[in-house]
Amino acid sequence: MAVVPDVSAILGQALDDEDATFAESVIAAIAHDEAIVPALFWYEIRNVLVMAERRKRIAAARTTAFLSDLALLPFSVDDLPREASVLALARRRSLTVYDATYLELAQRHDVPLATLDQALMAAARKEGVALFKPSARKADTR
């Protein structure tokens, strides 16, 4: 089954001080099927990694290698989030528009959302969107 990962879900694969176990499970799920992401995902991940470089959390060479590895995975970019739905989710669940975009994608495609963001997880639960479970690549709607 496809998954909608946000950046927090896979950062652990690049940054030593993030959750590597969860990230490895998400990346394995993507490799097995596919990830559906908004176009902003690629800008967001690059920004987070460059900021991490500035804070000496990652070397530039590691950023380049990580992005190259990600490019080999089956990512499907959904360029057309439904603006009205995204804005409604952001307002209703007090999310950033960025986070609401990931939630809207998971909701519309009826696939699990992979995130470590607690507010986004809570919003997904309230909206009835399944969350990615690393243990068996299953979803949890609790």
Where are these regions (language model features)?
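Acidic, PIN/NYN-like endoribonuclease modules and their adjacent C-terminal/linker elements
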Residues: 2, 95, 103-142
